[in-house]
């Protein structure tokens, strides 16, 4: 049986290797060659790409999809969809899910890999049904993980539930690289023995087991696998396409792909990748810590990047040790977007504040309340009681509690566009969906769609190193430099060589934050993380009780409620919505 290959170079490869920064301008020159290979599909959209396009790159993700479809008409295009979460970080009403899928199909999407971070089939049903109703390929997903709560029967039961919902195929998604070769053989064999279904396997290379797992899965009867072109493979990413093609050549599983065509593509990305070196993670080879922490490849690079932003890069090992403990408290949930971000952010909070759950992120509270769906086992009872504050947890499908919201969202976006003088796209619904998924950054993107200066500068290849170093080397490290009101993150190597500049939080638009509370003025309320103020809730002179929410901080793509550690009166509010803050900045004081 010929094995179908899905190459993930245009989506998960760069999401895992360099924080989802690959730009459309670096995809289109090679698109025709990719289209000519004969892949089963090309993953090129979804996951974190939508967020990265509007947050960092200043690209319209809908335009990206249309351009890729135009450039690669022969090959099915594939995306990763987070079920009821779509591409955002909360559940959306069914009417939003339906319209998003419709627009994705109309813009060029063919194959939808639909997963739910909780492995709750109720959260995948609406998306899967929408995909099939619009004539696209619906692939249900088992987000693979291990824990005392997960057995072979867990995966067989979920497979059966997905088949009852209605799918065209099923993917086993090993986002952390923890699927052992023997477990892969057993899982694929047992699913194939019990069910008539096309089966696909996705593995990450982070722990060094992925190639072996793919081969054993192929022996067991898997129909297709994910790989990445060699120059965009390994470490945090995926097994190399060429290696598997060569391994299977001349066997009953021969992929039929031309190794010479693949090498030309690899050569192209070998050069392109050099431009994105500033976003690369530190991993060389494999990382056995993942066998314990179960951190997906993309999450690991993001954790490293985010800890640097918090000036806490040296705390990575502590965070990795804390992640399994947080995961257990949250019912042994799998670590895949958005739960990977939720668990990772909570672990960072626990480490940086020096006290476990001193601050509970809004999304962590959501899992404890049941707002994301069923957890594999019950969550930590004490933490749940703390966030429920006497109310009952959610036990129904979370989206059943949501009223239709598309009409209201559309009216709101059109109103804001009129007020701000924003010209919406020809298909305005695409812009509406962009803002629906990412309210603040989506609107900011629409305001600056034609203003590249509002986003990260174009990446550039690292300059050649000089033959001789300066006699007095500069101190190496990562610094934030302000140039004409804009802040940039700069890496300075030993000897003073400056590599890629990347945009930091805009400096000019942010109000200066009070550095410290004057002596005797009260107890300072400080920022536990670097980020942006989402909303200031407390008002000057307001009396608050211990535990009251004072403001909401957006950091690491999550919302963190900053609560009063004691009763008092709010004085000296030093921030407003949209302001950038650093760790330890005083936000207000409690007198």
From Swiss-Prot:
SUPFAM superfamilies xrefs: Aldolase (SSF51569), post-HMGL domain-like (SSF89000), Single hybrid motif (SSF51230)
EC category name: translocase
PTM sites of type N6-biotinyllysine: 557
Ranges where the Biotinyl-binding domain occurs: 518-591
EC numbers on record: 7.2.4.2
GO CC annotations on file: cytoplasm
Pfam family, one: Biotin_lipoyl
Needed co-factor(s): biotin
Catalytic activity: oxaloacetate + 2 Na(+)(in) + H(+) = pyruvate + 2 Na(+)(out) + CO2
Gene3D superfamilies: 2.40.50.100, Aldolase class I
A GO MF label: pyruvate carboxylase activity
InterPro entries on file: Aldolase_TIM, Biotin_BS, Biotin_lipoyl, Carboxylase_cons_dom, OadA, PCB-like, PYR_CT, Single_hybrid_motif
Keywords, in A-Z order: Biotin, Ion transport, Sodium, Sodium transport, Translocase, Transport
Domain Pyruvate carboxyltransferase residue range list: 3-263
Assembly notes: Composed of three chains (alpha, beta, and gamma).
Function according to Swiss-Prot or TrEMBL: Catalyzes the decarboxylation of oxaloacetate coupled to Na(+) translocation.
Protein name as catalogued: Oxaloacetate decarboxylase alpha chain
Native source species: Salmonella typhi
